[in-house]
A protein has these predicted regions:
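Active-site-proximal, Lys/Arg-enriched surface segment
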Residues: 58-134, 248-253
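Short amphipathic alpha-helical "interface-anchor" segments enriched in bulky aromatics
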Residues: 91, 290-321
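Short, conserved catalytic/metal-binding motifs centered on acidic residues
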Residues: 44, 83-95, 122, 174-182, ...
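Electropositive nucleic-acid engagement tracts
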Residues: 8, 13-97, 223-224, 228, ...
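An internal, acidic/charged active-site-proximal segment
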Residues: 142-264, 348, 354-361, 367, ...
Length: 398
């Protein structure tokens, strides 16, 4: 099965893996796609080759290098020349009083703060092919824990990314994030550690045109800026216009007062009928082309599709443990299963569909179980003839 071969190939890139761990890990990753319902320890024990306690012990391996595992998959299957790191927090529903770091976090789907957990997903986006695979995830601390660390949420996000910069920067130095991260307290530490950040400004942000005046040789520094930018009356002589399918796109280099630095700005004016007047995207690499800024930012949304697939089909919200190590392993294993499904589809040369992929693997798994428990000598010619038809049965019906 292509899914299993991709998993084994990626696992070999992780150092210090012993044979018992490899067997249990391979079986668990297969079960993330083979189990049709909730994916928890009870279900793993029912469907898997090992006992429930064996899977619980597996999920306690906090030293497993998910970045290396996923990085191996990404290096083979994201083939575009332009890549970037996308980050995005995601709300995970969870109840109980004993769960570590449980608190109130923003749920974009509900449009409000809800009690539960939050993970920050780190993905690699392929701008040329509009694809994304996750590199890893980390659970977000609750407010009480952040207070004990003497940090706010933005500080914690930046400090974690900087702590993993060796692995991240080996893939790309460009980090793409939503408007929540367009704060000086996030941008400055990232830039000081050789990252470039692409994000989005609020519509009322204060930006200035760089001055066009030349040095006169007289005493005193010439003025820095030629005035604040009025986006309702943009000076088109300073901008480069790009052709886009919907609306108008302009790019220019500006000074951002809040960030205390020059940035490359992409201004998109949507078509008539939209309620918003303009959208402002920026890159801290002030030499970046305006169209590229927009392309990078829009590809960021592919990371949210990884979360969607993980929640709907890979059981990312189903972990019932109150152990921090097991929660972390479960979140990362779920997202890695989505990566493996994408890789398997690419290897087979078929269009990616997480639903169809899950149906294929579930059907193949059940057929293998039937053949194993019959206790008779199977007719391999008949099996080879009907195997493909049977595993495709559910997908065709869907």
């Amino acid at each position: 099965m292509q899914y299993q071969s991709e998993c084994l190939s990626a696992l070999k890139s992780v150092v210090n893996i012993h044979k018992p761990f490899e067997k249990t890990f391979m079986d668990a990753m297969k079960l993330f796609m083979a189990i049709p319902d909730r994916i928890n320890f009870l279900q793993l024990g029912r469907y898997g080759r090992f006992s429930e306690q064996t899977y619980r012990n597996l999920f306690e391996h906090e030293t497993f290098d998910w970045f290396a595992f996923n990085g191996s998959i990404i290096s083979k299957h994201l083939t575009g020349k332009r890549k970037a790191i996308a980050i995005d927090p995601s709300y995970i529903p969870k109840s109980g009083k004993k769960t570590p770091w449980i608190g109130y976090f923003w749920s974009g789907c509900a449009g409000e703060y809800k009690r539960g957990l939050e993970i920050m997903g780190i993905g690699v986006i392929d701008i040329d092919n509009h694809e994304c695979m996750t590199l890893g995830s980390i659970q977000t601390p609750d407010c009480k824990t952040l207070d004990n660390m003497d940090k706010n949420l933005v500080d914690w996000y930046s400090s974690y990314l900087i702590s993993r910069k060796d692995k991240i920067q080996s893939i790309s130095r460009t980090v793409v994030a939503d408007a929540f991260f367009s704060k000086e307290t996030f941008i400055t530490p990232m830039c000081e550690n050789d990252f470039h950040v692409i994000s989005r400004f609020r519509n009322d942000v204060i930006l200035y045109y760089p001055t066009l005046e030349q040095k006169t040789g007289k005493r005193g520094h010439p003025k820095w800026f030629d005035g604040r930018i009025d986006f309702a009356n943009l000076d088109l002589t300073r901008c480069k216009e790009y052709e886009v399918n919907k609306g108008k796109l302009y790019g220019l280099r500006v000074y951002a007062k809040a960030l205390k630095r020059y940035v490359s700005l992409a201004i998109w004016y949507p078509m008539d009928g939209r309620t918003d007047k303009w959208q402002l995207y920026f890159s801290t690499d002030d030499s970046m082309d305006g169209r590229e800024v927009l392309d990078y930012y829009r590809t960021r949304f592919q990371l949210e599709f990884c979360f969607r697939d993980g929640k709907q089909h890979a059981g990312i919200t189903n972990c019932q443990s109150t152990d921090f190590r097991k929660l972390d392993f479960h979140f990362n294993a779920s997202l890695a299963a989505v990566n493996l499904a994408k890789a398997a589809c690419k290897r087979l040369g078929i269009a990616y569909s997480i639903s169809s992929c899950k149906s294929f693997i579930h059907n193949a798994y059940m057929l293998e179980r039937f053949i194993c428990v019959f206790g008779i000598n199977p007719d391999m010619q008949v099996i080879d003839k009907l195997f493909k038809e049977l595993i495709l049965f559910t997908a065709r019906a869907a």
